[in-house]
Structures are given as C-alpha cells and as structure tokens.
C-alpha cells in the first residue's frame, strides 16, 4: 500500500488573471472610514455602517447609488438624513468626499497589484461604487488593465454579471481568475462562475496567497 504525502498531492493550476476589490482591500477597512464619519457626527463608530444595513432609506439609497441610479448628492442626502434621525450632526454635501478622505490606501496591497501586473498577469478592478472621489488616490490606468465599477456598468457585487463583465473585458475564462475581496458574500457570488476567492483580512495574509494562486514567487527581493 502506498500513500501520497500532502506535498505531492495535485495542486490547482495557477490562475491566469487577478480580480481585486478596492475599498477594504486596497484601502484600510471600510469600517475605519465609516467609523471616523460616525464619530465626526457625534455618534458611536459603528452607527453609519449599521444604518446602511438596517435603515430603509439609507440601505435603499446605497443600492441605487451602487448601480448608478442615484448620484453622489442623492446618496449623501439619504445617509445624512438617516444619521440625523439617530441624533447625529452631519452636513450632507461633501459627505462622500469626507469619507474618501478617511479611506487611506493600504500601500502593501497596492504594491502587490503593481507586482502582479508587472509580471504580465492581467488585473481587473471590480468595485461597487462609493462616490466620485473614491478612487482619487490611485491612477487606475497604472494599476489595472480593466476597471469595472458598478455604477458605470449598472450591476453590483455579488451579482455574477459584474464578474462576467470583468472576465470578458480581460479576455479570460472565469475559471482562470482569482478574486480578492473583503466581503464573503462577494466571493460566494464569484464562486458561482468558478472564480477562485481569497478573503482579504490583512496584507500579510493576502499577499502570499495571491502570489501562490497566480504561480508567482512567494517572496520578492529586498
């Protein structure tokens, strides 16, 4: 009787393309930015995100904004109204710009995208919209071969259609792609197209997993 050691078991072939989320993956966690907005409004740090999940007006506005049916100002008005209902003090106009101000880049993750693209692996941004200033800190053309932003294509994650669009624009079969996202339900949606998923928590965890999935060296020269 023979046995196969874990190190000799067949591995998945390397993925041919990378799909990557923006907020919470290439930036600090969204909870941090929304927490700062909540505190500035005189509320508990968890309030703004809770309202987006539970307040009918704010939740509906977010969904409409993400698919491009509600502009920045309309979303700002809805979220500001929800914040005011629970006793917060916030100026609606410029709310999204202030939120973007708190959305600092996670530089090691941004550098990973540069590394992957420099290695010849096509990279697509697949992101749900969050205001016109959301991507102001990065050069999208430098980092990505393709950008698929929900408000521009009329469909949002976790719908399979947004991932189909990204794969079609890259010219790569979905089964040859890997997606990095900080939200589990977005990964579940992509998995329905056989897109592999990496649940992002920290750069230290994600970077070696992305390199391994793409068949890239697991370490880089200092």
Segments (PLM) and residue ranges:
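Asp-based, Mg2+/Mn2+-dependent phosphohydrolase catalytic module
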Residues: 2-20, 114, 130-222
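N-terminal helical cap/lid subdomain that shapes the substrate entry/recognition surface
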Residues: 3, 8-110, 118, 130, ...
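Residue-level recognition of short, well-ordered coil/turn positions
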Residues: 69-70, 121, 152, 171
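Structured helix-beta-strand junction loops
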Residues: 119-120, 143
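A generic structural motif
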Residues: 120-121, 195
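Conserved phosphate-coupling serine/threonine residues in phosphotransfer and NTP-handling enzymes
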Residues: 127
């Amino acid at each position: 009787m023979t046995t196969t050691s874990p190190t000799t078991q067949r591995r998945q072939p390397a993925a041919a393309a990378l799909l990557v989320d923006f907020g919470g993956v290439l930036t600090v966690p969204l909870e941090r930015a929304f927490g700062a907005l909540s505190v500035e409004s005189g509320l508990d740090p968890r309030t703004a995100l809770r309202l987006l999940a539970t307040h009918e007006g704010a939740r509906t506005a977010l969904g409409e904004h993400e698919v491009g049916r509600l502009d920045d100002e309309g979303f700002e008005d809805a979220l500001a109204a929800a914040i005011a209902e629970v006793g917060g003090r916030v100026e609606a106009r410029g709310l999204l710009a202030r939120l973007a101000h708190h959305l600092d880049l996670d530089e090691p993750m941004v550098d990973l995208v540069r590394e992957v693209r420099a290695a010849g692996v096509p990279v697509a941004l697949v992101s749900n919209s969050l205001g016109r200033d959301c991507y102001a800190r990065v050069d999208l053309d430098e980092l990505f071969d393709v950008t698929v932003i929900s408000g521009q294509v009329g469909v949002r994650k976790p719908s399979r259609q947004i991932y189909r669009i990204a794969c079609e624009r890259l010219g790569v079969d979905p089964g040859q792609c890997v997606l990095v996202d900080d939200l589990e339900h977005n990964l579940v949606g992509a998995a329905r197209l056989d897109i592999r998923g990496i649940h992002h928590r920290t750069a230290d965890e994600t970077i070696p997993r992305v390199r391994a999935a793409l068949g890239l060296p697991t370490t880089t020269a200092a």
